[in-house]
């Protein structure tokens, strides 16, 4: 590891010579230490011009949004700490994760997911250590599920820490898997549209090699779906869920500003996902699950329908102050008002 400047193994220390690395690689052919050979090969790739450093990303330090939502804001089940990486992987694939964190500070974790998963079976989370971590992507998908999809899904990082807790932000490099279209609010729309077109071509040509996944991310939400939904996004690329979710927070009495932490969103983020059917839509402990039509609505930028707002309302319900299947409908009714629709009860 003295070859590299940090745990991401993306930059070499000074005075590393290609001829010397080649000699050591030749010698390593008779050496049982595969660990050493892999590092020498990485060093050779860098010396021969491969820009591994561009694969490194800095991990967000948003703090523990789940704890804040459920213990400070007192919502029933709102919030996720998942951080999208834009990398997906198939079940059985080997993934290497290189991590650099300040010495003695808490480490992030990694989550492997199943795209269009089951409400209580769609993710696996593992610890990370400094330097290299090797994983075989777990198979979560079941052939008994209603919607038949490829076994695999997005890779997420979980890092529920602030700079005060963790110091310098962790840096991570993931080797393996494949990139999927991921749009962060504020990204270049034209670049994203081109990524969508290219990914659609890959899915069409080799459907068994790529996960059918597209995600939109902003400070309010992760919105997960597939290329079917993304085609609608192409028609209205300026649309994101931010404005609609902001209205929900305002209605709940949760603000973006002010000094009282008990009433501030403080980075709490929703997790809205295309999932296997479990009713038309549902609210689980860490996400809201939708079917294709509802996911299309989210991607198209339209305001939610009754079912979507009803389920999100479950997450917003306040602990100790809600009546199941009743108070969550405040958000559904509020949605009706936003759209100037008539409520059948009012009639």
Where are these regions (language model features)?
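Extracytoplasmic low-complexity repetitive segments enriched in small/polar residues
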Residues: 10, 71-73, 78, 210-211, ...
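Short, solvent-exposed coil/turn linker segments
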Residues: 131, 143-146, 188, 198, ...
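Non-catalytic terminal regions of proteins
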Residues: 2-24, 99, 110-118
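Generic structural signal of hydrophobic/aromatic residues within well-ordered alpha-helices
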Residues: 1, 21, 43, 189-203, ...
């Amino acid at each position: 590891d003295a070859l590299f400047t940090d745990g991401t193994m993306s930059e070499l220390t000074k005075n590393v010579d290609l001829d010397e690395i080649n000699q050591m690689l030749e010698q390593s052919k008779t050496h049982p230490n595969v660990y050493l050979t892999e590092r020498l090969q990485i060093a050779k790739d860098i010396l021969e011009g491969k820009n591994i450093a561009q694969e490194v990303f800095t991990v967000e330090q948003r703090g523990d949004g789940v704890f804040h939502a459920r213990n400070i804001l007192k919502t029933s089940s709102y919030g996720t700490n998942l951080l999208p990486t834009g990398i997906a992987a198939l079940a059985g694939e080997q993934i290497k994760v290189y991590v650099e964190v300040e010495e003695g500070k808490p480490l992030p974790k990694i989550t492997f997911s199943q795209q269009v998963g089951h409400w209580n079976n769609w993710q696996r989370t593992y610890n990370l250590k400094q330097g290299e971590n090797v994983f075989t992507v777990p198979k979560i998908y079941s052939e008994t599920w209603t919607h038949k999809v490829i076994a695999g899904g997005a890779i997420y990082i979980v890092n529920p820490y602030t700079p005060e807790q963790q110091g310098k932000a962790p840096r991570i490099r993931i080797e393996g898997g494949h990139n999927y279209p991921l749009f962060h609010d504020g990204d270049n729309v034209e670049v994203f549209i081109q990524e969508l077109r290219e990914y659609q071509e890959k899915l069409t040509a080799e459907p068994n090699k790529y996960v059918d996944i597209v995600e939109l991310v902003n400070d309010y939400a992760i919105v997960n779906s597939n290329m079917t939904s993304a085609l609608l996004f192409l028609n209205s690329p300026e649309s994101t869920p931010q404005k609609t979710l902001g209205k929900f927070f305002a209605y709940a009495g949760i603000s973006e500003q002010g000094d009282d932490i008990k009433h501030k969103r403080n980075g709490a983020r929703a997790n809205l996902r295309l999932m296997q059917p479990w009713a038309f839509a549902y609210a689980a402990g860490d996400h809201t699950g939708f079917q294709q039509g509802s996911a299309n609505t989210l991607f198209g930028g339209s305001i939610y329908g009754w079912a979507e707002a009803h389920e999100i309302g479950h997450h917003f319900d306040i602990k100790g102050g809600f009546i199941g299947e009743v108070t969550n409908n405040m958000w559904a009714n509020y949605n009706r008002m936003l759209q100037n629709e008539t409520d059948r009860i009012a009639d």
